Amino acid sequence: MNHQQTIEELAYRSGEQVETCEAVMKAYEKYAQHHLKKARRNNLEEVAQAVAQATELEARICENILTQFFDLLAERISFFNRRGGK
């Protein structure tokens, strides 16, 4: 699954626009670069809040998209469930 397919799948699952998903994932990538150990499902509320501030979107929208992202990762990468991603 390439980047565009991932974004389109997140849009489908979350019910949000493709552009919104793209913005959230771009902000999440930047957040993860600086907070690698925090950028996981265990810290979903904190991550969503940081992404919301960066994108000026509502935190609930960011949390929804990030939840769908973590679910997608768990489905596609079998060891992800054992590493604290879910």
Regions found by a protein language model. Give the residues of each.
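Mobile acidic interaction elements
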Residues: 1-86
